[in-house]
Curated annotation (Swiss-Prot):
HAMAP family: Bpt. It comes from Sphingomonas elodea. GO terms for molecular function: arginyl-tRNA--protein transferase activity; leucyl-tRNA--protein transferase activity. Pfam families: ATE_C, ATE_N. InterPro entries: Acyl_CoA_acyltransferase (IPR016181), Asp_Glu_LeuTrfase (IPR017138), N-end_Aminoacyl_Trfase (IPR030700), N-end_Aminoacyl_Trfase_C (IPR007472), N-end_Aminoacyl_Trfase_N (IPR007471). The gene is bpt. Its main location: cytoplasm. This is Aspartate/glutamate leucyltransferase. GO terms for biological process: ubiquitin-dependent protein catabolic process via the N-end rule pathway. It catalyses: N-terminal L-glutamyl-[protein] + L-leucyl-tRNA(Leu) = N-terminal L-leucyl-L-glutamyl-[protein] + tRNA(Leu) + H(+); N-terminal L-aspartyl-[protein] + L-leucyl-tRNA(Leu) = N-terminal L-leucyl-L-aspartyl-[protein] + tRNA(Leu) + H(+). Belongs to the R-transferase family. Bpt subfamily.
């Protein structure tokens, strides 16, 4: 077996405008996930801050910036606060199903409404149904679409009010992308509920973590991620509990050196 077949090859994207910090440029390092070891590689890379998108694992590698910090919730210690308990009770009627990674028109229509409401003009705004199918189905790892529906009536499935593309990893669940109704006053806080549902289900399955992707201090779009405690951040010496949000996260030095 050659070295190239044993170890993944990494590539770096060209700089592009940062979607989180105005005036900044982002750059990503990435590798392909393929073959029988794709799941094992994805698990290992997630532990050093990579995320999956279809058959690619990537992480920020921006010149002079380490603002994007990987975060994961420690499921065993999670205790919902009063507001979160009310939300869990409010949505106790929903029917939750872990579906195979097969895109449906109903899912796509919900995604489009979500994007039009929350992220108009964003990078996914022009996504068509074929693009969505690729997003869901081109997964070389253990992946699901977790659907959240209103109660069934007379044998008919209830309305789809939320969904999340989720990977099952060796040490937890990784929430790849969630979307939900945003224009129903009877369903506020749906995104928060989906995160808590993942935390509780992961804990029940004996999985220690729920990976939430990247957190950027000072970004309003990212602020919600630190509501779920205890939460760990990936810093220079590895994963550590986030106790002071003024702390500065950075890529572990060994990883930075290897990817330079």
């Amino acid at each position: 077996m050659t070295a190239l077949s044993r170890f993944p090859r990494f590539f770096v994207t060209s700089p592009s405008p940062c979607p989180y910090l105005p005036g900044r440029q982002e750059r990503k390092i990435f590798t392909e996930l393929s073959g029988q070891q794709a799941g094992e590689l994805n698990d290992a890379l997630s532990r050093i801050g990579f995320r999956r998108s279809q058959s690619v694992a990537y992480r920020p590698s921006c010149a002079g910036c380490t603002a994007c910090v990987s975060v994961r919730v420690v499921t065993e210690g999670f205790q919902p606060n009063a507001t979160q308990r009310k939300l869990l009770k409010r949505y106790g009627d929903l029917e939750v199903t872990a579906c195979k990674p097969w895109a449906t028109g109903e899912q796509y229509e919900l995604l489009k409404r979500y994007l039009d409401s929350r992220h108009p003009g964003g990078g996914m705004a022009a996504m068509d149904e074929s693009d969505y199918a690729d997003m869901v189905e081109q997964s070389p790892v253990s992946s699901y679409v977790i659907e959240y529906r209103e109660p069934s009536v007379n044998g008919e499935r209830g309305r789809l009010v939320g969904a999340c593309i989720t990977d099952q990893q060796g040490d937890g669940l990784s929430m790849i992308y969630s979307y939900f109704v945003t224009d129903d006053e009877a369903r506020p806080g749906m995104g928060n509920f989906i995160i808590m549902d993942h935390i509780l289900r992961a804990r029940a399955a004996g999985l220690p973590y729920v990976y939430l992707g990247y957190w950027v201090k000072g970004s309003a779009r990212m602020a919600y991620k630190t509501r779920y405690r205890p939460i760990e951040v990936l810093g220079p010496t590895g994963w550590a509990l986030l106790e002071d949000e003024d702390m500065v996260g950075a890529m572990p030095s060994a990883v930075a050196a290897a990817l330079a």
